[in-house]
C-alpha cells in the first residue's frame, strides 16, 4: 500500500532539481501524487474505508497547498510540474 523506499527514491531522482534535493516542492508534489494515486486505487476496492478516505483528502489538500505555493513563487516551475504529472486537464 505505502510507497517502498525504492519507489520513493525513483520519484525523487526523477523530479529533483539537483543531486541532493529531496524536499523541493516538485519532489513533495510528485511523492504525494503517487501516494494519492495508490490510495485512490485502494478506495475503489474498499469503498467503506472512511479512515483512508480522510487521509486521502488530507494529502490532496497538502498537494494543493504546495501547488499554490509553487504557483505564487515560480509560475514556470508550476506549469512544468503540472504538465509532467498530468494533474490538470
UniProtKB/Swiss-Prot annotation:
Q: Name one GO molecular function term.
A: structural constituent of ribosome
Q: Which UniProt keywords are given for this protein, alphabetically ordered?
A: Ribonucleoprotein, Ribosomal protein, RNA-binding, rRNA-binding
The coiled-coil regions, if any, are none
A GO BP annotation: translation
A GO CC term assigned to this protein in UniProt: cytosolic small ribosomal subunit
Signal peptide positions (record): none
Q: Which Gene3D superfamilies match?
A: 6.10.250.3130, S15/NS1, RNA-binding
Query: Family assignment?
Result: Belongs to the universal ribosomal protein uS15 family.
What functional role does this protein have?
A: One of the primary rRNA binding proteins, it binds directly to 16S rRNA where it helps nucleate assembly of the platform of the 30S subunit by binding and bridging several RNA helices of the 16S rRNA.
Subunit composition and interactions: Part of the 30S ribosomal subunit. Forms a bridge to the 50S subunit in the 70S ribosome, contacting the 23S rRNA.
**Protein name according to UniProt:** Small ribosomal subunit protein uS15
Source organism of the structure: Carboxydothermus hydrogenoformans (strain ATCC BAA-161 / DSM 6008 / Z-2901)
Amino acid at each position: 500500500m505505502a510507497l517502498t523506499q525504492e519507489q520513493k527514491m525513483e520519484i525523487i531522482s526523477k523530479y529533483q532539481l539537483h543531486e541532493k534535493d529531496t524536499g523541493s516542492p516538485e519532489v513533495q508534489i510528485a511523492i504525494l501524487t503517487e501516494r494519492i494515486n495508490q490510495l485512490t486505487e485502494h478506495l475503489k476496492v474498499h469503498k467503506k474505508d472512511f479512515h483512508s478516505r480522510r487521509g486521502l483528502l488530507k494529502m490532496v489538500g497538502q498537494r494543493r497547498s504546495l501547488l499554490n505555493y509553487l504557483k505564487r513563487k515560480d509560475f514556470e516551475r508550476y506549469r512544468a510540474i503540472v504538465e509532467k504529472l498530468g494533474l490538470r486537464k
